[in-house]
């Protein structure tokens, strides 16, 4: 049976070595930062993730301190 995961939206606050990022979740009551790593699909597609980007992150129900970044949301003010 596949593990159930929560999907949240968040903001990248800090870039760490080895493709890790600190992410502040939007729809969670506590303002904790969680550790996010880049999924393989994003890595293969050469999608750049920078501090200030909005992302979708998949968080395990068992360990809510880390998650996998699965999607980078488009910026509303960019022209591309």
From Swiss-Prot:
- One Pfam family name from the record? eIF-1a
GO terms assigned for molecular function: ribosome binding; rRNA binding; translation initiation factor activity
> Which InterPro entries does the record cross-reference, listed alphabetically?
NA-bd_OB-fold, RNA-binding_domain_S1_IF1, TIF_IF1
Q: Which HAMAP family match?
A: IF_1
- Look up keyword rRNA-binding and say if it applies: yes
- Keywords from the named record: Chloroplast, Initiation factor, Plastid, Protein biosynthesis, RNA-binding, rRNA-binding
Entry-linked NCBIfam families:
infA
GO cellular-component term (any): cytosol
The entry sums up its family as follows: Belongs to the IF-1 family.
Q: Which PANTHER family match?
A: TRANSLATION INITIATION FACTOR IF-1, CHLOROPLASTIC
Protein name as catalogued: Translation initiation factor IF-1, chloroplastic
Q: How does it assemble?
A: Component of the 30S ribosomal translation pre-initiation complex which assembles on the 30S ribosome in the order IF-2 and IF-3, IF-1 and N-formylmethionyl-tRNA(fMet); mRNA recruitment can occur at any time during PIC assembly.
Tell me where in this chain the S1-like domain is found: 1-74
